[in-house]
Swiss-Prot record:
Belongs to the profilin family. This is Profilin-3. Its main location: cytoplasm. Gene3D superfamilies: Dynein light chain 2a, cytoplasmic. One of its GO terms (cellular component) is actin cytoskeleton. GO terms for biological process: actin nucleation; chemotaxis to cAMP; negative regulation of actin filament polymerization; positive regulation of actin filament polymerization. GO terms for molecular function: actin binding; actin monomer binding; phosphatidylinositol-4,5-bisphosphate binding. PROSITE patterns: PROFILIN.
Length: 126
C-alpha cells in the first residue's frame, strides 16, 4: 500500500477531514490529503514536541495556522483540540501521522482510528 493509500483509506476513510504523513526524522511530507499541508515550521515544532511533551502542553500545536490546545502528550501521541474539532498526532519509528477532525467525528473515535494505523505501521517496522 502506498503512503497516499494509508491517508485516503485509513484516515480520510475513517472520517478525518485532513491528514498528512510526515517523516519522523526530519518532518518532510510523505503523503497528504488534498489541499492539506503542514508547514515546515509546524513540522519542526511537532518533532520537538515529541521529544519534549511538556513543550506541547505549554505551547499547543499549530496545524495549518490553527492553534490547538493540547489535551495529552507523550513520546508516541499528541491529542489536541480546537472548538468542536481537533488533531491527533501519532509517532511511529519512521512516521508521524497528523489527522485533523471536526465535529462530525468524536474525539475518541478519532484517536482510536489514528492510533490503530500507528500500531499497524509499528508492527510493519515503520
Amino acid at each position: 500500500m502506498t503512503w497516499q493509500a494509508y491517508i485516503d483509506t485509513n484516515l480520510i476513510g475513517s472520517g478525518f477531514i485532513s491528514a498528512q504523513i510526515l517523516s519522523s526524522a526530519d518532518g518532510s511530507s510523505w503523503a497528504n490529503s488534498n489541499g492539506f499541508s503542514v508547514s515546515a515550521t509546524e513540522a519542526q515544532h511537532i518533532l520537538s514536541c515529541f521529544k519534549d511533551s511538556n513543550k506541547a502542553s505549554a505551547m499547543g500545536i499549530t496545524i495549518n495556522n490553527v492553534k490547538n490546545f493540547v489535551l495529552k502528550a507523550d513520546d508516541k501521541s499528541i491529542y489536541a483540540k480546537k472548538d468542536a474539532g481537533g488533531v491527533v498526532l501519532v509517532k511511529t519509528n519512521q512516521t508521524i501521522l497528523v489527522a485533523v477532525y471536526n465535529s462530525n467525528l468524536q474525539p475518541g473515535a478519532a484517536a482510536n482510528a489514528c492510533e490503530a494505523l500507528g500500531d499497524y505501521l509499528r508492527e510493519q517496522g515503520f
